Amino acid sequence: FNFEDLSRIPDYPNKNFIDSDDIKNLKDGEVYKYWEKSQKIILQNRKAKFLKTHNILGSINGIPFTKPDYTLGVIHIVRDPRNVITSIKNHFDFESYEKAFQYMVSKDAFLKGEDSARFSFLGTWSSHYKSWMSINPQRRITIKYEDMENNTYDTFKRVISYTNKILGIKKDINNDKLLKAISSTSFEKLSLGEKEGKFKENVFNNNNEKIKFFNMGPENKWKNVLPKDIAHKMNNYYKDDLNKLNY
């Protein structure tokens, strides 16, 4: 793995997928108008393309984020919300866990990048994961973040088997390559690479200071990190979701 490889799976949406004339008049929150147009353009070369997104699988003003005709398959990653909150607090530089929690339960939550094309509608944490899990399992694989940490080899082997299936690849999985991929993407190596300036996707706080992306890693365990009142609130608020996801 090299950090340069991250650019091979670009964020969607972003300005590279939208016509330059459309970009000129684009305002925050209006990128949904170009979802379908941009996805039709992506499909023109008839080659499978991997994209990553934070967007909820839903509609804005009657316009769906994507359609089955434009999506070969989905690798959906879900994470315990009690650990998500720590990452959100760090990423947005929130001053308290309470503010991070209010962000997670807001139906109007969004992510905005450096321009109006990089705008993702999130919704609540609960509605977000449910939206992606509504996809037919034949077109989707759902992976728990915790399984990537605790059962790394088998989890990533499942992902490769899934991508091979939807792409029609019949080759056996190369276990040596898989083990090397896992080794080269350990949290320790990714964190070191970020420290050395190899990671290019950091955000900055209000003081223009770079916020660490590979922040806590395996140390982000809610039982050891969250204030008791927030842990209690989240256990109650997400009780049904936690049971559904076996957390």
PLM regions and their residue ranges:
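Short, compositionally biased low-complexity segments
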Residues: Y153-K157, E201-F214
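An amphipathic alpha-helix signature
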Residues: R82-I85, Y153-I160, N175-L179, A231-N235
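PAPS-dependent sulfotransferase catalytic domain
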Residues: F1-I143, I169, N208-Y247
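Short, solvent-exposed coil/turn elements at secondary-structure transition points
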Residues: I56, D80, E146-M148, S184-F187
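Polar, surface-exposed loop/tail segments
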Residues: D172-S186
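Short acidic/His-enriched helical or mixed secondary-structure segments at domain edges of catalytic enzymes
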Residues: I182-E209
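A generic structural signal for secondary-structure junctions
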Residues: K89-D93, N164, S186
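PAPS/PAP-binding and catalytic site of the sulfotransferase fold
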Residues: F1, T142-I169, A181, K189-L190
